Amino acid sequence: MTHTSGINVIGTESSHGINFSEKGAINWTIAKANATARTKRASFNYNNANYVLLAGIIRKVTGKSYAANVKSRIVKPLHLKHTYIYRNIPRSKTDAISYLYRHGKNYQSASYANKYVVLQLPGAGNLFSTASDYYKIQQGLHNGKILTGKQFNYLSHLKSKVNTYSGGYYLKNGGKLKLAYGNFGDTHFTNWMQLTTDNKNGIVMFLNQPYGSKNQIKSVGYSILKHIKSGTFIRR
């Protein structure tokens, strides 16, 4: 949860052409982790394998699949209508398509998330959602529907953290803000979130046609944040 385990599995966002089951993907990750040299323990090294292994721990502790836990503990309590584990996306819906804005034209270089990459990342890249549902999840992590405020504080202040990252977030401004940025290998998807920790103000950006660098994207979000509540948010 703090990416200080020393686990350093390479190629988690590259397709290996395997149609993994959830259990199969977790076992594959364990084998890769055991066969790969580790980084220094207790130093920060973000790696998707940490979250895949966490999905495996959830399976072991609950006796149910990670997907079943997501449905019973998150999707149902929050009444989410647009959040699915990849394999469970209804046939009546499609997962999003990403594009680039290039040479003055929209919708260039169309790209879906690669099926095999998604399936090898349970707990780290196989949950598909919308910005509005994702915001409801953020609220649920504080209002008692998923976690209480006290439990969220524990999650975001784990003793093993070595920087401001803990439990999926970077906490800034003395813990008043939570931030997360992400993209997905070989696609153009980019997500950025910056919220106050009480979830009352902020922004959730889900982009399927980004333009510019990571910092340029964040600057666009920050220009919006300044209008939401001036003097509250940070640039990056």
Give each language-model segment a name.
Residues M1-L179, G185:
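Short, surface-exposed loop or secondary-structure junction motifs
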Residues N45, Y84, Q194, G202-F206:
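Structural recognition of the beta-strand scaffold that forms the well-ordered cores
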Residues Y51, L100-Y101, L195-T197, V204:
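Aromatic/pi-system hotspot detector in well-structured domains
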Residues V118, P210-Y211:
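A short acidic/small-residue loop/turn micro-motif
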Residues N183, L207-N208:
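Residue-level structural signal for beta-strand termini and adjacent loop
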Residues H188-T190, Y211-K214:
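A short local loop/turn or secondary-structure capping micro-motif enriched for an aromatic residue
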Residues G212-R236:
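Short, gly/Ser/Thr-rich active-site loops of penicillin-recognizing serine hydrolases
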